[in-house]
Amino acid sequence: MDGIVEQKSVLVHSKIGDAGKRNGLINTRNFMAESRDGLVSVYPAPQYQSHRLVASAAPGSLEGGRSDPVQQLLDPNTLQQSVDSHYRPNIILYSDGVLRSWGDGVATDCCETTFIEDRSPTKDSLEYPDGKFIDLSGDDIKIHTLSYDVEEEEELQELESDYSSDTESEDNFLMMPPRDHLGLSVFSMLCCFWPLGIAAFYLSHETNKAVAKGDFHQASTSSRRALFLAVLSITIGTGIYVGVAVALIAYLSKNNHL
């Protein structure tokens, strides 16, 4: 009866070991590891003496276990306690050179997790595509601003108003009908050189007719001609009057000497 129980125990241990080899998981049920000297505890420290288990195995099973590779079966709960007793929870920071050397030395099938400082750019730095950062001081930062003065706007409005008033006055002057210079023409005809005065009077009437028809171009031409003839008539008439006066004075003075 005892031999049957021992054989069942050996079969259970062998199945668990084979399952651990196949899936690579930690055995949480068996706290024993097979070595060349037999089953020994994986916790030889004094604080884990309570976890030691003594089991007997058949000579055949021990001989079969000697040929198998050595395998350690760990308890995750106890392993966590042992790690916490030696290392406190903390973030370990390493430089890039150390991490690179470690990566070259470890096997390709290993996976390790490391925590490094966050190299996020600050408000005074710029990030380039290659991952480098450049620090900017307050003097290097230039902000292009645009200033606008209210007085300049007022001056601009005044200039625009002046320009608009000038253009309006010019437009009004151009739109004004030309003058006929009728009074000047009559004076030149009666009091001055009458042939030119008569021509100026005729052109003044032509100016009025063109304005009545709405032909401002013809009216302006007639008005300029009437003004020119009237002024010329007055000039010639004034010259005639001055000449006559001088001749009369000379004649009278000659008679007095006689």
Swiss-Prot record:
GO biological process terms, semicolon-separated: intracellular protein transport; positive regulation of synapse assembly; regulation of postsynapse assembly; synaptic vesicle clustering
GO molecular function terms noted in the UniProt entry: glutamate receptor binding; protein homodimerization activity
Main location: membrane
Mode of membrane association: Single-pass type II membrane protein
GO cellular component terms attached to this protein's record: cell body; dendritic shaft; dendritic spine; early endosome membrane; excitatory synapse; glutamatergic synapse; intracellular membrane-bounded organelle; plasma membrane
Expressing tissues: Enriched in the cerebellum and also expressed in the neocortex and modestly in the hippocampus (at protein level). Expressed in hippocampal neurons, both in cell body and neurites, however its presence is enriched at excitatory synapses and also found in postsynaptic cells.
Residues in compartment: Cytoplasmic: 1-181
Residue numbers carrying Phosphoserine: S137
Top-level taxon of the source organism: Eukaryota
InterPro entries the UniProt entry points to: CD225/Dispanin_fam (IPR007593)
Extracellular topological domain: 203-228, 250-258
Stretches that traverse the bilayer: 182-202
Keyword set includes Phosphoprotein: yes
UniProt similarity note: Belongs to the CD225/Dispanin family.
Protein's job: May regulate AMPA receptor content at nascent synapses, and have a role in postsynaptic development and maturation.
Subunit: Homodimer. Interacts with GRIA1 and GRIA2.
Record's protein name: Synapse differentiation-inducing gene protein 1
Origin species: Rattus norvegicus (Rat)
Highest classification ranks of the organism: Eukaryota, Metazoa, Chordata, Craniata, Vertebrata
Gene designation per UniProt: Syndig1
